[in-house]
Amino acid sequence: MERYLYNSGIKKIEYYLKRYNLLDLKISKLSEFADDYNYSNGYNKWLKNKCSSLEEDAIRNIEIEQRIYKIRKWQSLINAILEHYKSKDKVKYKFICLKYFKKLTPIKIQERMNLTEQEQDDLTKVILNFILSVAIKKNMLKEVEV
């Protein structure tokens, strides 16, 4: 775990957790963008301009597909973690739902779950470290020398 940029991994995990409810929308928008782009910039434009826009279109489509694949991979990981916590640890599951999906403040979470802010911080670290370890095992984070 030393070879991975810890802070960057945690930030990435929190990014996907906070935007989990919007991931399907993001995937569909990227797919629509790729489809619309293909129809509006077809072969006719390439023939008229006599340039390498066809290559640019192909590169852009590949980049969009890579982004969609990456988002789906993170979505799948989060789904698996949620299912794991839902069956094994209801407290962590509820905490994730309240903090990241409903975006409640620590005070509201304290009222609902009877957890102090320190306990919430500790629970956050445990959850994020668990997700980080799973993401590392699945090669979802890039290796960096520390």
PLM region descriptions:
Residues F95-I96:
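A short pre-motif secondary-structure segment
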